[in-house]
Structure formats: C-alpha cells, structure tokens
Amino acid sequence: MNTLPLMLIIVGIYAVAYRYYSAFLASRVFALDDRNITPAHRFNDGHNYVPSPRWVVFGHHFAAIAGAGPLVGPTLAAQFGYAPGLLWLVAGAVLAGAVHDFTTLVGSMRHDGRSLPHMVLSEVGPVTGMVALIAVVIDVIIAMAGLAIVVVNALSQSAWSLFTIGMTIPIALVMGWWMFKSQPGRVLVLAPSIFGAIALALALIAGHAVAGSSLASIFLLGNHQIVIILCVYGFLASTLPVWMLLEPRDYLSTYIKIGTIAALLIGVLYVHPRLQFPAFTQYVHGGGPIIPGKVFPFLFVTIACGAISGFHSLVSSGTTPKLIDKETEARFIGYGAMLVESLVGVLALVAACSMNVGDYFAINVPPSVFARLGLQPVHLAELSKLVGEPLAGRTGGPVSFAVGMAEIFHGVPGMARLTSYWFHFAILFEALFILTTIDAGTRVGRYVLQELLNKVHKPFASTRSLAANLLASGFIVLCWGYLVWGGSIATIWPLFGTANQLLAAIALSTMTAWLVNHGKAAFAWLTIIPAAFVLATTISAAVLSTTGVYWPMARHPGTEAQGWVETILMTAFVVGAVIVIVFSALRCIQTLRGVPPPYARAPELRDGRTSPQPAAPFRCC
C-alpha cells in the first residue's frame, strides 16, 4: 500500500480535530477566557511559576511527554498489521489522548497548577487522594523501567551508539554552565545552542571512528553494565541542579525531536514507501512472537503513549500549568502537543511496516524464536552491512525503528551513502527522546515520593534537604533499576503499558468529577467514554498478563523474585486505580444529588472578580 494518500488523510484528520473538536472543548466545555488569571501570573515567583511564550511552553511540554512510547509501542504493535495500530493511534489520540491531556491541563490550571493527586484530593476526597499519590509513585517506577529497558536494548553491544549518547552528557554540562552561569544575571541562548548542535554532530561522526578503533571494546557493553550506567545517570540527573544537566539536555533534545519528526514526515511524503505488512496478520488472534496476546486488549497497552498516556497527566499537572501565560493557550499546548505525539507514533508504525516482514521479525525476536516462525530474512545481511551493526535479535523496537527510518532516508537522492549515519542518528534520536523523560521522570518520582513520605515524617517533604533528596532519588532509581535488571521487553512493556493506561483512567475519572462538581455534568460524557474504554481494555490486559506471564514467573525457579514483584505491582496498581475510579463515580452521584463538592472555587479574573462559571451542581437532563 502506498503511504502518501494514507499520510495525507491522517494529517487532515488531525487538522480537522484540532480546528473543531478542540475548539468545542475550549469554548463550550472549559469556557477558556484570557481574563482569567493563570497560575503563572497569580503565583509568579521567577522559579516554578513563570509566564512564558506559548511556543516555549509547547516545546517544554512536548519534550516532557514525548518519550519512548510513540516510537516503541507502534513499532511492536506492527506485529498485528498496520490497520489496528493506525486506527487506534488516530482515533485514540483525537478522542481520548488529546482530551485527557487538555482536560488535565485546564483542571490543574483551575487548581492553581497543582498535581493530579492534589486534584483527586480536592474533587473526590482525602482518602482517595492518598491512594492516587501511591498509584502515581508506582506508575513512575514502572514507567521509568519501561523506558530504560528500551535504551538498554538499543545501546547494548553498540560502541557507536553508546559513545554518541555518552557524549551528550558533557555537551549538556557545558551548555548548562554557558547558558546560566557564564554571565551572572543573564541567560545566553544563541551561542550555546549553536555549540550544542555542532558538538552533537561531531559526536555522531566521532562515534563512527571510535567504533572502528581499538577504543571500541570500551564501549561494547552488555545489558547489565548499561543498566548500572543508566541508574547512576538517573540518580545524578534527579539530584543535580536543573540548570546543570536537565534543562540544557531538554532544550537541546527539543530541537532534535521536532527537527527529526519534520524531516521524517517530509521523507515519508517524498519517498512514500510501500507498506509491506498486511493490514492484519495472523497474530491478531494471539500467539505472536513479540506480544503473545490477542489484538484486544494488548494492542492498546502496547501502543500506550502514542494514543493516550497517563504519564502525560503528571506533566499536564506538573510544570506546564505553571508556565502558561494566557488561559486560551492551553488548547494549543494540551490538545496540540498530543496530536504531534500521535503523528510520531504513526511515522514509527509506517517505518516498521515498510520493512520486509521477515527482516522485521528477525530484528525484533530472539534468533531461537525466529527460527520457529517459518520466515526468512530478505535484506537483513545487506541492512547490517549498510548500518555497520549486527541487527538480528536486537529486540525492543528501537533498532527496527532506526532501520526503517534509515531505509526511508536511503530513498532520498544523495542520502544512500549516509545510511549508517541515519541509523545511528535514529538511535541517538530515540535515546534522547527517552533519557529526557527518564531524568525528568525520576525527578518527578522523587517529588511525589517526598510528598507521600511527608505524611510519615515532615522533613522528608523538604526539597532543600540533601539527605531527603538523595534517599528519595535512590529509592526510585533502585526500584526501576531492579525491574530492568531482571526483566525483558516482553515482561516490562506490558506492565508499563497497563500502569500507564490505568493512570490515564484515573486522570479521566478525576476530571469527570471536576466537570460534574463545577456544573458541567452535561459534558461529562467527553471524559466518561474514553475512561470506560481505557479501563475495560487495560483491566483485561492486566488480568491476562498477570495470570499468563507474571504469576507463572513467580512459581518458576529462577524467576520467583521478579515474578512476585511484577505480580504485586500490577495488582496494587489495578486495585488503586479501581478505588479512585469508583470513588470518583460516587462523588459525581453525590454532587448530582445536591451534596456540595469538596472544592468549588471559580477562576479569578484579572480585575479581582470571579469568572461567571457555575459552581453549583445541576442535573444533565
């Protein structure tokens, strides 16, 4: 199938959804009004609450939400064929994912930029808020493990890739000092940005030289060695001042992310590769070598972030609402950024499905499993020679995405000789996608864990306490590091996808309670329908994964500990999610019966009055 008309249709759907559906949400449901004072202005402290230009906020928000999910999930879901993945990526993002992000962002802005657990506490109740806080800590740990396993598989036994990624750390440190400390009182942007771009290009070129030299053995590391390096990196990145590593790395990666996505979209439209996968494969009925379950429900937890992501609710109720200058800009940032991430997922699926079927499975499953599939690789040896890396058995998704991306650019005139560079640039692109989320996510996990421990011992809540920061960061890193050390993409990714989707259901149910509590019950169906669908698919996947994978691991000698940990994590998160969702539903019923909601303050206008939005409940019919 030719991808050109397909891509034009998909981009058209995104444009129509943004133009009309997001406008309906902004005007009719949320009644966004630039007269409302945003938290960035109300609490402007020059540190956390800072009114910022909308393009700057969009870049920050997109860099924070765009991790491995839209790249890896659709690539793995190609096992089912291109049709199921494309349908869910587009429909899920338009009707569920973008609604989830937009609603959570506006809800947080109306709660002074506070977090999702705080909104649960305010709109549903204190006990449910505590459950949500615990669920968020568990989700962060699982999410970091899911992202880290992808990086481990991408960098394992690849001197070129590991050297290039390693060099981004000193580059970011130099940029951080140059931008924020070289001239006290000023923040430099242009010169450090030029330096970062040039240094990154030189690191990519130098990686090729290192891989062919005697230094290659230093960077040819196995999975466990890379896990240790990632844990050390995550610990340092979450405890160092944000200006030193986190901010410059995010800033640099944003340009690379957006530039690469634009280049890949242009490449797909220019080359318009033919999809070599069928619309549906035999694995839609189960028994697949990558994802053993059926297309329902495992497609939805596999694609995860590309269509809807609960992790986004932590960003939409974290730093982003503290930066928005005008309330109407939430539409562009909340709804628009999710559509761009969905487009990334579509491009990843196209890149995977444009490969030969035999080559795709030869890369994404272990050789022993591939030998039983009855398939033969067609271009694998040639591709390995072109990219300068062994490709067979490089499971996890990132390598096959990089191969698909390199093949697309191979078809652009003048680019054929640069295939190996495009491949390793794609690995760099993916790793930067993921590492920016790992360092930010570990820091978010530290904040939430300290907030939780505050209920036990007050000093834990102080972010100025070095001991508290080190202990909380160390705990988060050890937890996700343990999961990665003994896990695989086959066990961790379903766990990540399930926890991530359940967090989305928690956020949507909380936002439903918020709408009902604030007199918008007539529009509650906008969040109830996606919440119900996500909950049904995810609970089904959780039960099947636990009974079919994690519990058998817990009863098998050699994997008992890992199996028990993953069984307990999955069970705990499911129970926590169900508690929050049930109590959110009960809160809605109470409000509709006239019981006053816990929180019913309307937004404050710039002239000191309150916005004329109904705080009293009303019935929807």
Annotate each predicted stretch with a short phrase.
Residues 52-111, 122-126, 139-161, 334-359, ...:
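Membrane-interface helix-loop-helix modules in multi-pass membrane proteins
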Residues 17-71, 254, 293-294, 298, ...:
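Membrane-interface "cap" regions at the ends of multi-pass membrane proteins
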Residues 10-20, 136, 143, 198-202, ...:
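Selective recognition of specific alpha-helical transmembrane segments in multi-pass small-molecule
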Residues 23-50, 74-76, 86, 90, ...:
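Flexible loop linkers connecting adjacent transmembrane helices
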Residues 1-17, 194-243, 247, 252-253, ...:
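A generic transmembrane alpha-helix motif of multi-pass inner-membrane proteins
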Residues 53-69, 220-240, 266-273, 285-325, ...:
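Hydrophobic, membrane-embedded alpha-helices of multi-pass small-molecule transporters
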